[in-house]
Curated annotation (Swiss-Prot):
Enzyme Commission number(s): 4.2.1.41
Name of this chain's protein: Probable 5-dehydro-4-deoxyglucarate dehydratase
Biological process (GO), any one: D-glucarate catabolic process
Organism: Xanthomonas campestris pv. campestris (strain 8004)
UniProt pathway annotation: Carbohydrate acid metabolism; D-glucarate degradation; 2,5-dioxopentanoate from D-glucarate: step 2/2
Length: 305
């Protein structure tokens, strides 16, 4: 089944609001807890995000089996019930990414977030070929995630965009201002631009000036109303509100996040536990916050619920 949106319609819809990247729930035995995941999606989708990205980085894609990815995507499509577009992941090598994109289309997802190739070195031309092959394997709109080894420059990205009408967006997880400026200067409104650095609220205001109108909010998982309010302040360029919340909440939160590799996901599940919506442990190779560390996000969240 094809998406309810054309790629250009999808880009317009996603770029107009905040993006939800839900965690994936696991039980004490580390099995995918689909009932808890579905219940949480019901709660999240009651808040007006512009789109939901199932089984993404915050959702521990790297720790899921392909069957679990399919189940997570189908659950997201069912539970959101058309209230917002659902974007499914594709990743690993090109053949697997193509299969994942085609599975997402069968599972009625509305678009694809294409993650970097797995465990290999590659240049911009190789990444461009990878993206093009995935785009041509599906009718769904595709957002390419620039991160790790997936480093497309403006020339390579423009070439793929010309060849693939369904390449609808670029998510930046690199943080190279020169690269992002050149990409937006060359491609302009041809693509949707998504902020994808960890704790994207930190960079939301400067990225807005580079054409990045939305971002993936992990904090939305446990403070959706706060996250929507902060996003509104960013779009309004309300510097006073933005820097107050950065100083009082976001930047102290990132200090704990940076304490250990992988805590960018672990701290989100800690935040969910702190607000009474536990999602279970993270899967290895990630590690959960210690009990002593858990007190810190609880204190930071405070009255922001």
């Amino acid at each position: 089944m094809s998406s309810r949106y054309t790629p250009s319609e999808m880009a317009q819809a996603l770029g107009a609001g905040l993006l939800s990247f839900p965690v994936t729930h696991f039980d004490a035995d580390m099995a995918f807890d689909e009932p808890a995941y579905r219940s949480n999606l019901d709660w999240l989708s009651s808040h007006p995000a512009a789109g939901l990205f199932a089984a993404g980085g915050t959702g521990e894609l790297f720790s899921l089996t392909l069957d679990e990815v399919d189940r997570a995507v189908r659950a997201a499509v069912t539970q959101t019930a058309g209230r917002m577009p659902v974007i499914a992941p594709a990743g690993y090598g090109t053949a697997i990414a193509v299969a994942m994109a085609q599975a997402a289309e069968r599972n009625d997802a509305d678009g694809i977030l294409l993650f970097p190739p797995y465990l290999t070195e590659c240049d911009a031309d190789g990444v461009a070929e990878h993206v093009e092959r995935v785009c041509k394997a599906t009718s769904l709109g595709v957002i390419v995630y620039g991160r790790a080894n997936a480093r497309l420059d403006d020339v390579a990205l423009a070439r793929v965009a010309e060849r693939c009408p369904n390449l609808m967006g670029y998510k930046d997880g690199i943080g190279d201002v020169d690269r992002m400026t050149r990409i937006y200067a060359r491609l302009g409104d041809r693509l949707l631009y998504v902020g994808g650095l960890p704790t994207a609220e930190t960079f939301a205001l400067p990225y807005l000036e580079m054409g990045v109108t939305t971002y993936s909010s992990a904090i939305f998982n446990f403070l959706p109303e706060w996250a929507l309010s902060f996003y509104a302040a960013v779009r309004a360029r309300d510097h006073a509100t933005i820097y107050r919340e950065l100083n009082d909440f976001v930047l102290p939160y990132t200090v704990l996040r940076n304490r250990r590799a992988g805590y960018a996901v672990s701290i989100v599940k800690a935040g969910m536990r702190a607000v009474g919506r536990p999602a279970g442990p993270v899967r290895t190779p990630l590690a959960d916050l210690t009990e002593d560390e858990f007190a810190q996000p609880t204190q930071l969240i405070g009255g922001r619920r």
